[in-house]
């Protein structure tokens, strides 16, 4: 049976000498694995069309088990995004987080909307690092944990102007006057905590212009990745490449 699915490639794995298995996140929010025969042979025309981030109409044969890709009508390859290695790496982190946050039989239209949103934003010049932060914030609960940035985990005070650190002892933000209770709390600027709270709660269709300093973006990334590591034991391959690139840059 011939099937047609509009979607975005979120995973691509080599299979044997010439084939690969891709996973698309379709417009309904379902993960669809597909076998691509002779994908690594340039004569088939599928090599460029079965890479990560490709957005298109995927036509495939489906009987039992995994479908076999026949052709792709490409809508957007996000070519400009690929030209910048940092943008590409952060986009990889976004797709990795979204893919890992979903079980194989999950259906989540929001995840498709989120992925399409961040790829469009990165392609149009918005900060790829910020987009990765947004994805990690929005996917937290799918990994079985959450974090809050708007009140004290100790006193329950909602005076955000006095929040200065994130405590893994108390599982939340704490006030400056409470630092003595956890001397090893992760110190972070009040503005960063405020913006994390805003981004966590703001629907993506309400997000328009962004103007956040690099210093704050770096603080956000460091804390969010630490939260994923501490609460879920997770580390992302995309972040490993970003760290390597930053070491080379400096």
Curated annotation (Swiss-Prot):
One of its GO terms (biological process) is DNA recombination. Keywords: DNA damage, DNA recombination, DNA repair. SUPFAM superfamilies: ArfGap/RecO-like zinc finger, Nucleic acid-binding proteins. One of its GO terms (cellular component) is bacterial nucleoid. InterPro entries: ARFGAP/RecO, DNA_rep/recomb_RecO_N, NA-bd_OB-fold, RecO. Involved in DNA repair and RecF pathway recombination. Belongs to the RecO family. This is DNA repair protein RecO. It comes from Staphylococcus haemolyticus (strain JCSC1435). The lineage of its organism: Bacteria, Bacillati, Bacillota, Bacilli, Bacillales. The gene is recO.
């Amino acid at each position: 049976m011939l099937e047609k699915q509009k979607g975005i490639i979120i995973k691509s794995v080599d299979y044997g000498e010439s084939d690969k298995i891709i996973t698309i996140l379709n417009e309904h929010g379902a993960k669809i694995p597909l076998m691509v025969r002779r994908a690594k042979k340039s004569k088939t025309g599928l090599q460029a069309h079965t890479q990560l981030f490709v957005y298109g109409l995927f036509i495939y044969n489906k009987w039992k088990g995994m479908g076999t890709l026949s052709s792709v009508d490409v809508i957007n390859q996000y070519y400009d995004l690929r030209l910048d290695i940092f943008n590409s790496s952060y986009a990889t982190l976004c797709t990795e987080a979204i893919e890992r946050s979903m079980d194989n039989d999950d259906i989540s239209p929001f995840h498709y909307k989120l992925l399409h949103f961040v790829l469009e934003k990165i392609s149009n010049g918005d900060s790829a690092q910020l987009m990765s932060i947004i994805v990690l914030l929005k996917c937290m609960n799918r990994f079985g944990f959450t974090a809050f940035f708007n009140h004290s985990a100790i006193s329950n005070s909602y005076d955000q102007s006095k929040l200065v650190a994130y405590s893994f002892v108390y599982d939340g933000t704490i006030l400056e006057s409470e630092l003595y209770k956890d001397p090893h709390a992760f110190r972070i600027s009040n503005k960063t905590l405020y913006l994390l709270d805003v981004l966590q709660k703001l629907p993506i269709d309400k997000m328009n212009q962004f103007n956040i300093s690099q210093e704050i973006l770096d603080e956000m990334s460091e804390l969010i990745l630490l939260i994923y590591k501490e609460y879920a034991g997770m580390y992302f391959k995309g972040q490993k490449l970003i760290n390597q690139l930053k070491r080379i840059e400096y």
